[in-house]
A protein has these predicted regions:
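Beta-loop motif signature
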Residues: 199-243
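Calcium-binding motifs, dominated by EF-hand helix-loop-helix domains
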Residues: 44-48
Length: 243
């Protein structure tokens, strides 16, 4: 355990041994939503490309004929025309409409596709240019490369936003939710800080140390020990810093 803590995370301590270590729109809505997850097979109306005209938007899945629990592809329709299809055999998919940067007069679309236990196999960010869908970023990007479904928060149209991710990094503590701040600039999404807050009940969990744990000032072999958590001490994880 000491090696894992030292090599992968830098966790900050406090006296209490607390480590400083997702509104539904109507069917017709011509106004831009900043953070709207769409329902499958339901029509919505958004001005996606800032031309003053609302596009009719809907996404569907094509059910696997051999197993109704799975689909073989996800398709996006704009003004009743199939403009995008992702072929992937999975169990769930969702589209979210976002206005990440209101200064560009366009809306962003986020697609996530995955399987059981909210495991995510593909995600991408897209825009409608009036003629076709353009995918400008996806989960090959390290800042978006997570294995489970995420939701959006703090979308204010200034280019910055947060995603809340289920267990973005493997830790001995098991599952947890972390808030990851991101920004969109020049069609690229990047993280804005290296330290991520745990959210909801995740930051309230208490863990009991099974043995002494050395906590280092930095995730480095040359780092000095900040303090030692003693066997039996109770710990809360509040922040994480992946390296």
């Amino acid at each position: 355990m000491k090696g894992n803590f030292k090599k992968s995370l830098s966790i900050f301590g406090a006296l209490s041994f607390a480590f400083t270590a997702g509104f539904l729109l109507s069917n017709v809505n011509v106004y831009a939503a900043t953070n709207q997850t769409l329902e499958l097979n339901k029509d919505y109306y958004f001005d996606l490309n800032g031309d003053g005209q609302a596009e009719k938007i809907k996404y569907t899945t094509q059910v696997n004929k051999d197993d109704n629990d799975f689909f073989n592809s996800v398709s996006l329709f704009i003004n009743d025309k199939n403009v995008y299809t992702k072929k992937l055999t999975d169990t769930w998919a969702k589209y979210t409409v976002l206005d990440i940067d209101s200064s560009d007069n366009t809306l962003e679309l986020n697609l996530q596709i995955g399987g059981y236990s909210d495991v995510m196999d593909y995600s991408s960010f897209q825009r409608w240019n009036g003629a076709s869908i353009v995918e400008f970023d996806n989960n090959k990007n390290k800042a978006l490369n997570y294995t489970r479904e995420y939701s959006f928060s703090n979308v204010k149209g200034n280019g910055r936003f947060n995603i809340v991710v289920d267990t973005p990094y493997s830790l001995p503590i098991g599952c947890f939710y972390a808030n990851i701040p991101l920004k969109l600039q020049n069609n690229k999404i990047t993280t804005t800080t290296g330290t991520y807050n745990l959210v909801g009940s995740s930051k309230k969990y208490k863990y009991k140390a099974k043995g002494n744990i050395k906590v280092y000032k930095k995730a480095s072999k040359k780092s000095k020990v900040k303090f030692t958590v003693k066997k039996g001490d109770k710990i809360k994880m509040i922040k994480i810093k992946p390296m």
